[in-house]
Regions:
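Asp-based, Mg2+/Mn2+-dependent phosphohydrolase catalytic module
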Residues: 1-28, 129, 133-139, 150-230
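Short glycine-rich or small-residue beta-strand-to-loop segments that form or flank ligand, phosphate
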Residues: 30-31, 142-144
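Short catalytic-loop micro-motif centered on adjacent basic/acidic residues
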Residues: 63, 144-145
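Structural motif
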Residues: 68, 146-148, 205
Length: 230
């Protein structure tokens, strides 16, 4: 085993090497939107998923609507159609299982409905604004954001949140990256836009399983919220 630098050890017979670990200060926090800073309980997308599937003639339960929460909304719809219970009801209704054409159609129908109701579910969660202000003003951290919402949806939330005193330094929407949660790309995009490195100096906060995985996939700290969990 050879000492390459003061922080890296390399074994020529191995495909792997030992690397240093960051032990410095936290420099940035990336927060999810619905269920983390506003819309306690994440009702906004859930009620729209219910409406979209009801319109298709295949009603779903609130539990089914919530299960994939955190994903890009088109992916969310696709995951609902892959649930055995939903597939069974779809087959009973149409004599076939749901396909990608159905997913695309439902997503097209979902978008205007979601944008239309976002303001009805845009109340900041108690303590969120105060917490972010403390992180920014007292700990001098940069504030980023990720979401399963698309850019037009985030634009609606920006205005509603800013009127309540919340404005992240960075916004990244699900349609700005090759693949959204649980993939790491939105976190990495935040790191670039916040100009924060290393990635280990960032904490990702979310109320969904995919949102927590997004942080761990990116290589940063990841914190899950329970009381507002979807």
């Amino acid at each position: 085993m050879t000492l390459i630098t003061g922080s890296v050890l390399k074994n020529p017979r191995s495909e792997y090497r030992m690397v240093r670990h960051y032990q410095g200060k936290i420099k940035g926090v990336i927060l999810d939107w619905a269920g983390t800073v506003l819309d306690c309980g994440v009702y906004s997308p859930a009620v729209v998923f219910l409406d979209v599937f009801k319109t298709e003639g295949v009603p779903i339960t609130m539990e089914e609507a919530r299960e994939p929460m955190g994903a890009h909304k088109k992916v969310h719809i696709r995951k609902i159609t892959q649930m055995e219970s939903v597939r069974r009801r779809w087959f009973e209704k149409f004599g076939r299982f749901p396909n990608e054409e159905d997913v695309e159609r439902m997503f097209v129908n979902f978008v205007p409905l979601q944008i239309g109701c976002l303001l009805d579910y845009s109340q900041m969660i108690t303590g969120a604004v105060e917490t972010v202000n403390f992180l920014r003003n007292n700990m001098h951290l940069k504030i980023g954001s990720t979401t399963g919402f698309t850019t037009p949806m985030v634009d609606v939330l920006k205005k509603a949140a800013s009127e309540q005193g919340y404005a992240p330094d960075v916004y990244v929407a699900a349609d700005e990256v090759p693949q959204a949660r649980p993939y790491p790309y939105m976190v990495w995009m935040n790191a670039i836009r916040m100009d924060v490195n290393p990635i280990e100096a960032i904490v990702k906060v979310d109320d969904t399983a995919d949102g927590v995985k997004e942080g761990t996939s990116a290589g940063c700290w990841s914190v899950g919220l329970a009381k507002t969990v979807s």
